[in-house]
């Protein structure tokens, strides 16, 4: 089963600095980060970001470093966005790009941290530095994976997700797989609003192959015409697949998540 694409994330406000010679007429015009990141059980951090371009532009990338001074010393980790097949598209009004950071030593803790970003699109780059609040992502909910699995070895999602001011929902996942391609994700997030249903979807295919246990951050984009999500429980169904072409192994996580407002 081959699932395709578009990891989307979110976000919102901060200091943006144009690289020397960058034009406001074409290419990249903004780099922003969400105000809130979530720490998973495993110590990974998921964070929503947004890239904005004056005209639709493909090949967008974002590299970021998250750093925090805490009681254990200095925690620092690197994250990269733009390795999803469709996630590298940047357009006017902003395109979400979720970023996941690994677990450093000492680990990240709840509280403020600084994210330094460099976004590039259309041959132009911009940098930004913002203070974000790291919060508890809740327990990890795991999928049931067969004991004899060869490609997809583990899949889990944090029980909390960030409801961004844009309406996008940023969710942290953990995955362990042995595959030369993928992993691929597809899923829906639903919340009952009286007689109406709020719905958001994600479809993502990550380039570069899949190794040991690591984080992947996903952005669920609201379906057109769907009522806005509220900061309360929502139901998730997420499928992940990995493996050689035509022989994917897949796992499904069904969970109730708590949506929390970005600070």
Question: Can you annotate each of these PLM segments?
Answer:
Residues 1-24:
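Secretory targeting and sorting signals
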Residues 28-71, 148-194:
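Short, surface-exposed binding/anchoring microloops in extracellular/periplasmic proteins
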Residues 50-53, 66, 101-103, 119-121, ...:
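Hydrophobic beta-strand positions in extracellular immunoglobulin-like domains
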Residues 84-95, 205-215:
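Short proline/glycine- and polar residue-rich coil/turn motifs
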Residues 103-114, 224-235:
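Short glycine/proline/serine/threonine-rich loop/turn segments at secondary-structure transition edges
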Residues 124-147, 246-263:
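Short beta-strand elements
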């Amino acid at each position: 089963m081959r699932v395709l694409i578009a990891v989307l994330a979110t976000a919102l406000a901060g200091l943006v600095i144009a690289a020397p010679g960058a034009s406001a007429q074409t290419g990249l015009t903004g780099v922003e980060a969400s105000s809130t990141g979530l720490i998973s059980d495993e110590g990974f951090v998921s964070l929503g970001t947004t890239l904005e371009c004056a005209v639709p532009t493909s090949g967008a990338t974002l590299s970021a470093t998250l750093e925090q001074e805490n009681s254990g010393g200095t925690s620092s980790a690197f994250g990269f966005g733009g390795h999803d097949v469709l996630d590298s598209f940047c357009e006017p009004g902003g395109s979400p790009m979720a970023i996941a950071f690994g677990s450093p030593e000492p680990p990240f803790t709840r509280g403020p941290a600084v994210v330094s970003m460099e976004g590039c699109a259309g041959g132009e780059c911009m940098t930004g530095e913002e203070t974000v609040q790291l919060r508890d992502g809740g327990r990890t909910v795991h999928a049931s994976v067969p004991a004899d699995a060869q490609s997809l070895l583990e899949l889990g999602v944090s029980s909390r997700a960030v409801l961004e001011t844009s309406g996008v929902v940023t969710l942290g996942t953990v995955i362990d797989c042995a595959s030369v391609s993928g992993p691929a994700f597809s899923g829906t997030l639903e919340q009952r609003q009286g007689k109406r249903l709020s719905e958001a979807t994600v479809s993502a295919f990550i380039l570069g192959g899949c190794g040991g246990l690591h984080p992947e951050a996903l952005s669920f984009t609201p379906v057109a015409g769907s009522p806005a999500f509220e900061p309360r429980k929502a139901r998730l169904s997420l499928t992940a697949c990995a493996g050689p072409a035509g022989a994917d192994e897949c796992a499904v996580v069904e969970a109730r998540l708590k949506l929390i407002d970005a600070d």
